[in-house]
UniProtKB/Swiss-Prot annotation:
Requisite cofactors: Zn(2+)
A GO BP annotation: malonyl-CoA biosynthetic process
Name of encoding gene: accD
Name of this chain's protein: Acetyl-coenzyme A carboxylase carboxyl transferase subunit beta, chloroplastic
Protein family: Belongs to the AccD/PCCB family.
Residues that bind Zn(2+): C51, C54, C70, C73
Organismal lineage: Eukaryota, Viridiplantae, Streptophyta, Embryophyta, Bryophyta
Localisation per UniProt entry: Plastid, Chloroplast stroma
Catalytic reactions of this protein: N(6)-carboxybiotinyl-L-lysyl-[protein] + acetyl-CoA = N(6)-biotinyl-L-lysyl-[protein] + malonyl-CoA
GO molecular function: acetyl-CoA carboxylase activity; ATP binding; carboxyl- or carbamoyltransferase activity; zinc ion binding
Stretches assigned to the CoA carboxyltransferase N-terminal domain: 47-315
Pathway assigned in UniProt: Lipid metabolism; malonyl-CoA biosynthesis; malonyl-CoA from acetyl-CoA: step 1/1
Length: 315
């Protein structure tokens, strides 16, 4: 089935999460459940969880097999960066980069707890050094540079470490002429770092300009629930192709902030992926189960027609 036919089916069912996706997702779920009968789970964190959309109780073992998609309503629950790397990258090909980079508390920021203690807490909780993992790996045998933000680490907030790791990833992709994918999941800039976090927006954006315009290389932004604030206002919306997951919350400011500023009521659902897609702000909405295949097809098309400038290295 072509992508155009796929979208026509969604519109015919009155939305991108219609009966077609539900059936396809359930079929995928049954296949994965049979294949991964013995998947391991951490029983100390509980055996059951609840869907954020339909509130149906979900068995954690099946949920992991389902790529964290609710088998009742098709809602896409949040994934960790580790799970997303496993979803997108061919097994055994992932090479992480800059794992030892950690944030410094230069402002000595403190509210209910110090910033330093908060970082340590989330490092122990997630096993990550900060809110993003970067590296290179093969996606359907295509070598790509990949950055995956993790909302479980301080709400995926963008601080100096996140900005620097993305910057270095783009530099590496620039030098090696690799396509770039960034999976966004963030509450925005990290307030505990002040202007150091805000400047990451300009730093990443300016480097992407060289990457996309000067070197004619290919950047795909994948927006997941939630993508907000400074990430939306910078690299999140600069992809040559912008893909979102179904029903992903994508915004700059929250609904209440907008309503209080404009002093008028904002309609429900205007900041979800489907609304942005119909307004022309997104290129594709792709269910998680199909994402790797769709990206593989895009990279095949890209490899047939890519234009690369020679002798124009910035670094």
């Amino acid at each position: 089935m072509s992508l155009m036919n796929w979208f026509e089916d969604k519109r015919r069912f009155g939305g991108l999460i219609g009966a077609f996706i539900e059936k396809a997702t359930k079929g995928y779920i049954l296949n994965e459940r049979e294949r991964d009968k013995y998947i391991k789970i951490d029983t100390t964190k509980g055996l059951w969880t609840r869907c954020d959309s339909c509130e149906n109780m979900l068995y954690v073992r099946f949920l992991k097999q389902n790529k964290r998609i609710c088998e009742e309503c098709g809602y896409h629950l949040q994934m960790s960066s580790i799970e997303r790397i496993e979803l997108l990258i061919d097994h055994g090909t992932w090479q992480p980069m800059y794992e030892d980079m950690v944030a410094r508390d230069v402002l000595k920021f403190s509210d209910e707890d110090s910033y330093k203690n908060r970082v340590i807490f989330y490092q122990k909780r997630t096993g990550l050094t900060d809110a993003i993992q970067t590296g290179i790996g093969k996606l359907n045998k295509n070598l790509v540079a990949l950055g995956v933000m993790d909302f479980q680490f301080m709400g995926g907030s963008m601080g100096s470490v996140v900005g620097e790791k993305i910057t270095r990833l783009i530099e590496y992709a620039f030098k090696e002429s690799l396509p770039l994918i960034i999976v966004c999941s963030s509450g925005g800039a990290r307030m505990q770092e002040g202007t150091l976090s805000l400047m990451q927006m300009a730093k990443i954006t300016s480097l992407l300009q060289f990457y996309q315009v000067r070197k004619k290389l290919f950047y795909i932004a994948i927006l997941t629930y939630p993508t907000t604030g400074g990430v939306t206002a910078s690299f999140g919306m600069l992809g040559d192709i912008i893909i979102a997951e179904p029903k992903a919350y994508i915004a700059f400011a929250g609904k209440r902030v907008i309503e209080q500023t404009l002093r008028q009521k904002i309609p429900d659902g205007f900041q979800v992926a489907e609304s942005l897609f119909y307004s022309g702000l997104l290129d594709l909405i792709v269910p998680r189960t199909f994402l790797k295949g769709v990206l593989g097809e895009i990279f095949e098309l890209y490899s047939l027609g890519v234009y690369k400038e020679s002798n124009s290295y910035l670094f």
